[in-house]
Regions:
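The conserved beta1-alpha1 loop
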Residues: 87-89, 229-230
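The feature captures the conserved acid-bearing segment of alpha/beta-hydrolase catalytic domains
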Residues: 184, 190, 195-251
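Catalytic nucleophile-loop/oxyanion-hole region of alpha/beta-hydrolase
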Residues: 98-102, 106, 118-156, 273-277
């Protein structure tokens, strides 16, 4: 299990090890350290969050397609809270991405912010993206949450979708049909237009590239967006995709907030232990609470 978690970092953190050698940047870390690293922002009560682990959100499929649900401490059985669904990026097949420190801590942050944090492992992979399969997993995860909302303390009509890194294309699943229960969308250092990405172009048709580019679904009625950008992100074409997305969002008069970390590396929420990282993480949590109609505890 530990080795699988280490392997999955190849895509998620492929450029940070190089970038970290630059002056004034975080020190170079081993893969084992990066696997365990939590988000650089903490809130009181994170250690008291109730975690429902390894739920099978699909009736069949790979054994690693599991979900963890993070519930606020002290929440009564009858109480309901909005759900925040955290979507990981591309990983080698069989890697339990939900078990990485970054997603475990984001789940806890959501829970102590009076929301239900959801992390799950899906089939978005490397080197072949398997976008259609991953989209099916995302739809299955949402269906599972809504069908089991009462048992999971979830308000099924208040959901936020959060994507990271190579998981950006899956934002298109929520944007395409614009379901009323998806109240807001968040993207952290994520691909938002894969039509210019060489790895994606090498494996997918032009039709699929457009279908899984969130930029194609921008409109004035798009759910409110929060975009976090790493200024020193070294993943080829990633920041270009964000910049194109932001320009198009403005042109379409969409509701959007953009938070840029000028010194931020890819995965700055674990790599850059500085005030700007914490400001952006706090702002993202505030955005989620506001859009989901939750007050801070």
């Amino acid at each position: 299990m530990a080795q699988k978690v280490i392997n999955l970092l190849f895509v998620f953190l492929c450029v940070t090890a190089v970038s970290a050698q630059q002056p004034s940047q975080p020190p170079r870390r081993s893969m084992q350290e990066l696997v365990r690293m939590p988000v650089v922002y903490r809130l009181p009560g994170m250690d008291r969050v109730v975690v429902k682990s390894n739920l099978k959100y699909v009736p069949t499929g790979e054994p690693h397609q599991l979900m963890d649900v993070y519930v606020p401490p002290g929440l009564a059985k009858s109480e309901r809270r909005p759900a925040v669904l955290f979507i990981h990026g591309s990983v080698p097949p069989g890697s339990p991405a939900k078990d990485m420190g970054v997603f475990q801590s984001w789940g806890r942050l959501a829970a102590v912010s009076n929301m239900i944090g959801i992390t799950f492992t899906h089939r978005l992979s490397f080197p072949k993206p398997m976008l259609n399969e991953a989209a099916g997993d995302l739809n299955a995860a949402i269906s599972y949450l809504r069908a089991n909302a009462d048992d999971l303390n979830i308000d099924k009509d208040r959901i936020c979708v959060v994507v990271f890194s190579g998981g950006g294309p899956l934002l298109s699943v929520a944007m395409r049909d614009k379901p009323a229960y998806v109240r807001c969308l968040v993207a952290f250092y994520a691909f938002l237009d894969i039509q210019q990405s060489e790895p994606h172009r090498a494996n997918e048709s032009a039709e699929t590239l457009k279908s899984f580019s969130p930029i194609a679904y921008l409109a004035s009625e798009t759910a409110p967006l929060f975009i976090a950008r790493a200024g020193l992100d070294g993943v080829p074409t990633l920041n270009d995709s964000i910049d194109r997305f932001v320009r198009e969002a403005m042109a379409k008069n969409a509701s959007i907030i953009v938070a840029n970390h000028p010194r931020g590396l890819h995965a700055f929420d674990i790599q850059n232990d500085d005030e700007r990282s914490r400001e952006i993480i706090e702002a993202a949590l505030t955005f989620m609470r506001m859009q989901l109609g939750e007050r801070k505890q």
